[in-house]
Each structure stands twice: as structure tokens, then as C-alpha cells.
Design a protein with these regions (language model features):
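PP2C/PPM-type serine/threonine phosphatase catalytic domain
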Residues: 1-167
Length: 167
């Protein structure tokens, strides 16, 4: 219904072009969690000192990388790096749902491309290694993105599943 709502809102505002947006949603239902993603906002999992990008950017550049037509390095500089191949409200909206096993103390990082355009995975890992609180991590990453140019909206959400006392 989210896709239809964005399409309807775009039509109601009489826009010449269509409105579109990305979505990355994390939901925990112990002992699993679910990731729903459309677009190029990302989900990273940080556990045992390892950062893993679980989501896949739904961009034309990433499609070309997947097809072996373009390297990852070239994709970052490509004119297609920010051209979405799937988005809510666009002609094509292909949500990807991933089911993963929950793990106590793993850190979940959801972010828009406004962060990942300006902050490398290596820098994300450095910040996660030194993390003392989710709030502080978000503030540091936001500042890193702004210092790197801050050319897009920047959204950062960090969470961790922690057992109750006695579990």
C-alpha cells in the first residue's frame, strides 16, 4: 500500500514528474528479524567486529555491476550511481524481503545514501568499533557525512537487541 500511497500523493499534488522514495525497514520477531528494502537506502549488520552490507542497492549502476558490465569502483563514479531501478512511487517498485537469524548484541544500522555517499564502509566499521551509544554513533556518522560534503538528505537509525536481565 505504501507504493500506491506515494503514487496517489504525487498525482494529488499535480506534479509533472512522479514522486518516489526509498524504504529500508527492519523488524525483529525473535528469534528472527526481517528486512524489507526498496531503493538504495541500506541496512548493515555489525557483529563480532565484522560489518556486512545485507541490503543491495536497487540502482542502475548496481544492476550493471551484478551483470558484470561495470566494476564496483566505476559504479560509484557512474552517472547511474543514483538512478534507482526500484523505488516506492516509481514505475518499478520491487521490495526485497530478507529473513535473518537474530543475535544478541548485534548492531543494526539503517541509513540513506546521504550517509553512504560520503562515509566509507571502513569508516562505518571504525565508528562501530568505538561505539559507546547509538545516539553518539548517529551524531558522529552525521558529522562525518556533512564533513564529506553532505550533498543529500542523511538518515541514520541504529539499534541493538539486548537480552533482559536473567536471559
Amino acid at each position: 500500500h505504501a507504493h500506491e500511497a506515494v503514487v496517489a500523493k504525487s498525482g494529488a499534488e499535480g506534479r509533472k514528474g512522479r514522486m518516489a522514495t526509498t524504504l529500508t525497514l527492519w523488524m525483529g520477531v525473535w528469534p528472527n528479524f526481517y528486512l524489507l528494502q526498496v531503493g538504495d537506502s541500506r541496512y548493515y549488520l555489525w557483529r563480532q567486529g565484522t560489518l556486512t552490507q545485507v541490503s543491495r542497492d536497487q540502482t542502475i549502476a548496481q544492476d550493471l555491476v551484478d551483470q558484470g558490465v561495470m566494476s564496483r569502483t566505476a559504479a560509484k563514479r557512474s552517472q547511474f550511481a543514483n538512478v534507482l531501478s526500484s523505488a516506492l512511487g516509481a514505475d518499478e517498485a520491487t521490495p526485497v524481503v530478507t529473513k535473518l537469524q537474530s543475535e544478541w548484541n548485534a548492531v543494526h544500522l539503517l541509513c540513506s545514501d546521504g550517509l553512504t555517499k560520503h562515509v566509507t564502509d571502513e569508516r562505518l566499521a571504525e565508528r562501530l568499533t568505538a561505539m559507546t551509544s547509538a545516539k553518539e554513533l548517529c551524531e558522529q556518522l552525521l558529522q562525518d557525512a556533512l564533513d564529506g560534503g553532505g550533498t543529500d538528505n542523511i538518515t541514520i537509525v541504529v539499534g541493538r537487541a539486548v537480552p533482559k536481565d536473567g536471559e
